[in-house]
């Protein structure tokens, strides 16, 4: 079996050299899915996984725009249309200086499985640019978004490819992108998700990823006879996902001890309650300030510059910042402090060695493709509402989100049960694979 996996990875690596993030994502899937494929005659010999790792289409383009100093700036834009076997391409747009082909291909590949797990008819895709919205004025961001969409619009559509937000792309950017698409196409369609409520958006969509992480993690804990009530919770990040995860953790009776950004993390021993979280939302969403500004209002808290929050003793850890933020040494700290569960809010935030450390020590571990699927799930619900020309209530959407996250958890149990342990990585990968693989077989070699 190891030989088959190594041969497969060698072939994929040959075609995707110098793409470490993409190869990391492919390796994780291959190690759990290939043993399953070998046992199933219907899949064996069809090269389905090899077809999955090859994007159906890679789009790269120049994005030229003019800053406030009337200087011309040039960025690079991408859209990876990875797999459309079960529906139109669906996945976010990321605006960040680190964006490159490897990162977007890893995200698009993960998106195939994540979207499949929701059971909604959505294929996998991802896109973005190396543009950095931090420090830019609203006018500069608008000019960039308009230039970006002027090329992207010809590749997307409500039945072809439906982008959404990601790191660096929030409601402001989605608004500018949608406005330019509408201007170019002269039509009002659900071509983007994450829209404002007054112009085609869905209630709960901004909160969905963060809420979903906690709903999924709660299901894991309940399966072990546990829950968030009375638990100390460490969260990384302070963006949309982290904020919304902290909100639900608090409602469920947990105590949120930390939040972070790229400058470091804050530790509030007494807990970041709803009032304190509201202040953080003001700092990050409106003032776009660094997390350490929190201490001006709450001086009893501590700020640790250029450090990660995993050194704080906790019961539950929710990495909600970015890929590979939780390394092997961080995992060792969680093990040392008797952490019982790690639920991923970000995409691939844990390194392979960290995942191994956690699972070897029987710590419940929820891979992002399962635990953070809430965002794309409600994106799918937003698409449905756009098609119906009808809006569901907040309670209706939240109930549907809880149901979807519960179904994803059950799928992970169905495919990931081992002796006295649930391998959620294996369960999520195989459950996501089966639906897409069956569709690909039915549609022939295309």
Briefly describe each language-model feature range:
Residues 96, 115-229:
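Glycine/serine-rich phosphate-binding loop and adjoining beta1-alpha1 elements at the start
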Residues 106, 160-164, 187-192, 235, ...:
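General beta-strand structural signal in soluble alpha/beta enzymes
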Residues 42-73:
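Structured beta-strand/loop patches that form or line metal/cofactor-binding pockets in enzymes
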Residues 2-25, 220-221, 320, 335-446:
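Adenosine-phosphate binding glycine-rich loop
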Residues 264-365, 370:
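Rossmann-like adenosine-cofactor binding region
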Residues 193-196, 201-311:
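Glycine-rich phosphate/diphosphate-binding loop of Rossmann-like nucleotide-binding domains
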Residues 61-122, 126, 130:
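Phosphate-interaction motifs
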């Amino acid at each position: 079996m190891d030989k088959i996996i190594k041969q497969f990875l060698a072939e994929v690596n040959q075609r995707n050299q110098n793409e470490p993030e993409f190869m990391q994502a492919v390796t994780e899937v291959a190690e759990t899915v290939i043993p399953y494929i070998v046992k199933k005659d219907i899949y064996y010999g069809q090269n389905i996984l090899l077809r999955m790792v090859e994007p159906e289409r890679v789009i790269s383009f120049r994005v030229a725009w003019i800053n406030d100093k009337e200087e011309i700036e040039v960025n690079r834009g991408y859209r990876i249309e990875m797999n459309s076997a079960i529906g139109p391409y669906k996945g976010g747009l990321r605006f960040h200086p680190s964006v490159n082909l490897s990162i977007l291909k890893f995200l698009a590949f993960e998106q195939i499985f994540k979207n499949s797990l929701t059971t909604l008819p959505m294929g996998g895709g991802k896109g973005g640019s190396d543009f950095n919205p931090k420090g830019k004025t609203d006018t500069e961001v608008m000019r960039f978004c308009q230039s970006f969409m002027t090329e992207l619009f010809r590749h997307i559509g409500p039945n072809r490819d439906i982008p959404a937000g990601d790191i660096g792309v929030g409601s402001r950017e989605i608004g500018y992108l949608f406005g330019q698409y509408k201007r170019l196409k002269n039509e009002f369609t659900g071509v983007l998700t994450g829209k404002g409520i007054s112009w085609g958006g869905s209630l709960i969509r901004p909160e969905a990823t963060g809420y979903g992480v906690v709903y999924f993690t709660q299901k894991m804990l309940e399966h072990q006879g546990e829950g968030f009530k009375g638990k100390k919770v460490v969260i990384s990040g302070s963006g949309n996902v982290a904020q919304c995860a902290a909100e639900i953790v608090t409602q469920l009776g947990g105590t949120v001890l930390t939040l972070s950004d790229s400058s470091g993390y804050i530790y509030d021993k007494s807990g970041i309650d709803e009032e304190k979280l509201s202040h953080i939302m003001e700092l990050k969403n409106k003032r776009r300030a660094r997390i350490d500004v929190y201490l001006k209002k709450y001086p009893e808290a501590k700020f640790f510059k250029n450090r990660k929050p995993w050194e704080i003793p906790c019961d539950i850890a929710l990495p909600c910042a970015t890929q590979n933020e939780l390394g092997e040494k961080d995992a060792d700290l969680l093990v040392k402090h008797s952490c019982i569960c790690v639920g991923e809010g970000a995409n691939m935030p844990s390194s392979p060695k960290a995942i191994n450390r956690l699972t070897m020590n029987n710590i419940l571990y929820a891979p992002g493709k399962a635990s953070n699927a809430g965002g794309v799930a409600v994106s799918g619900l937003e698409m449905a509402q756009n098609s119906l020309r009808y809006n569901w209530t907040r309670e209706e959407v939240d109930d549907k989100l809880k149901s979807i996250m519960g179904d994803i958890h059950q799928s992970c149990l169905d495919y990931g049960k081992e002796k006295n342990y649930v391998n959620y990585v294996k369960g999520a990968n195989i459950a996501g694979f089966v639906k897409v693989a069956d569709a690909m077989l039915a549609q022939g070699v295309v």
